[in-house]
Amino acid sequence: MAWKVSVDQDTCIGDAICASLCPDVFEMNDEGKAQPKVEIIEDEELYNCAKEAMESCPVSAITIEEA
C-alpha cells in the first residue's frame, strides 16, 4: 500500500514537531514551514511515523491519504 503525504502551507505554523518526530518524512523549508521530504510513502514504518506526526500537529496541517 502507498500513502500520499502533504502539508497545508497556509495552515502550518512552523511548530516543527513533525520534523522532530519523523525526520525521514518531514523537513522545514526556508519559510520555516514543514514540507514532506517524500510525497509518496510505501513503507509501513514511515507511514506510522508520519501518522504520529499528523496526529501531533497542533493545527492539523498534515494530510495523509491512500495513493
Swiss-Prot record:
Cofactor note: Binds 1 [4Fe-4S] cluster which readily converts to a stable [3Fe-4S] form.
Keyword Transferase set for record: no
Cytoplasm among keywords: no
Pfam families: Fer4_13 (PF13370)
Annotated [4Fe-4S] cluster binding sites: C12, D15, C18, C57
Transmembrane segments: none
Domain of life: Archaea
Paired cysteines (S-S): C22-C49
4Fe-4S ferredoxin-type domain location: 3-31, 36-67
SUPFAM superfamilies (UniProt xref): 4Fe-4S ferredoxins
Keywords: 3Fe-4S, 4Fe-4S, Disulfide bond, Electron transport, Iron, Iron-sulfur, Metal-binding, Repeat, Transport
Function: Ferredoxins are iron-sulfur proteins that transfer electrons in a wide variety of metabolic reactions.
PANTHER family xref list: FERREDOXIN (PTHR36923:SF3)
This protein's name: Ferredoxin
